[in-house]
Amino acid sequence: MVSMRVKILFYSVMTFLLSCEERYFISLDPDVTDQLVINGFIDQSEGPYFIYVALTQGDWRPPLGIENAEVVIKDEAGQEESCAHMYEGKYSCAGDVVRGRLGVAYQIEVTYDNQLFTSSPDRMPLVEASSLMSWTEDQIITTSINGVDVMESSINFDLDVSVPNSEGVHFFQWRFEETYQVRETDFPDPFGTIPPPCYITKKTGSKQFELLFFNEFSSRQVTLDDAIVRLFDQSFLSKHIFIMYQHAISESYFNYLSQVKTLTESTGTLFDPPSGRVQGNINTIDATVQAIGFFGAIRVDTSYSVIYPNQINYTQKDGCLYDPSIADYQYEPYCADCIKLSGSLKEPPIYWSTVN
C-alpha cells in the first residue's frame, strides 16, 4: 500500500439540486402498473426545489413521468406555492413564496386523476455533522470475467464524522458522486481545432448511500471506512473531483431510507408483501389508491475532494491521445464523440473551475 494520505477540509455550500436529486427506484415488480411514485425534497437553499411524479409501468420498465399533475408545496405557517412542470415528470418549485428554513416543517399536495395525495409534514433538522473525507492509494483484488483474481490499484476514501453534543437523536445520510474530464482525440485538421472536453458526472461509492444516527448513548465520532473504493482508470489522467452530499434528515425520512437500503441489499422488490413494501409518507383519502415515495425537508452540506494526476502513483497511456500509427477506427468510439458517454455534458458543472 502506498503511504500517501490526503485530508480534505469540509465546508458547507448550498446544494445544486439538479445534480443530487435521488429517486430511489427499487426492483419494481413487473406485474404492478399505474402506481403513483412521488419523490422530492426541500433544503435550506433559496430554491428551486424539485418534485418528481411518475407512474409505474410494469415489465421492469422505469416509471413514466407525469406531465399533468398539480403540485403544491406548503410550510407549517400555511404559505403555499404551485410548482411548474419542467420535463418527464419533474416539477420545479421556485421558492418565491415557500422557502427552505431550518427547523420548519413542509409538505406537498399532488393532485392527479382526481385524486389528492398529501405528504405528512417533515421538519428540517437544525443540527449538522462535521465530516472529513480522506483518501489513500491501495491495492484491491478483483475477479476477471474469466474467474481469475487480479490485483488492481485503487483510491479509497474514508469518511470521519463528528456530531456536536446536543440533546435528542440526529439522523444523517451521505451520497457520493464523481466528476471528471474526457478529451476526444485531436485528429489533424487544417484549422488546428482542438475538440472541447466532455464532463462526466456519475454516482460513486461502495454503497448506494450511507446512513447513521447519533443519540446520547452513542459515540459522537464515527469513521466510515472505504466509503468510496474507486479503481484507477484513464479518468485520473486529468483533474478528478469526488463530491460528498451530507443530508441531515428527520427520523421518518431515516426510517424510509433504511427500508430502501435493506431492500436494495436483498432480493426483495418494492411491492413484496408485507416486508418488501417500503412505507413512505405519501397519503391519500382513498385507501384503495396508494402512492410510494417520500417528500422530505433536509439540511444539505456538500464537500469536494480534488485529485490531480501528480498526486497519485498511477500512469497509463491516454487511449484517446492521437497516434499517427493508429487508424481512426481503432480508437474507442467515445474518443471521436465523448458526448455519447452516460452522464456526459460539454459544459462543465458550476463547481468545476471553483474547486481546486
Annotate each PLM feature:
Residues 16-19:
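C-terminal motif of bacterial Sec signal peptides marking the signal peptidase cleavage site
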Residues 11-13, 283:
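A periodicity- and composition-biased signal for non-globular, repetitive helical segments
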Residues 1-3:
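Short, Lys/Arg-enriched N-terminal segments with co-localized hydrophobic residues
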Residues 5-11:
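Sec-dependent signal peptide recognition
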Residues 21-356:
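A sequence/structural signal for flexible, mid-protein segments enriched
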